[in-house]
C-alpha cells in the first residue's frame, strides 16, 4: 500500500495494489476509484483534500491492525 499527496493538484491517492488500470468509478465529486479488468480496486483518489482534511494530519498516518 502506498499513499501519495500531490500538492499542486490537491489530491491524495491510496494505492492498494499494482495492476493494469481498466476504468474508474466516480463515487462523488471528490472520490474516484481505479479498477483493473476484473474490477478489483487498485486505488482511491481523493480530490480537494486540503478542503476536507487538515493537511497537518497527513504528516502522521498510523496504520493499525491491518493484518
Segments the model singles out, each with a brief description of its role:
Residues 1-67:
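Small, basic N-terminal interaction modules of short regulatory proteins
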Amino acid at each position: 500500500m502506498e499513499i501519495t499527496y500531490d500538492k499542486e493538484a490537491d489530491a491524495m491517492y491510496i494505492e492498494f495494489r499494482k495492476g493494469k488500470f481498466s476504468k474508474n468509478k466516480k463515487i462523488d465529486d471528490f472520490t474516484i476509484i481505479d479498477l483493473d479488468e476484473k474490477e478489483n480496486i487498485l486505488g482511491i483518489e481523493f480530490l480537494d483534500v486540503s478542503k476536507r482534511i487538515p493537511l497537518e494530519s497527513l504528516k502522521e498516518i498510523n496504520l493499525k491492525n491491518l493484518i
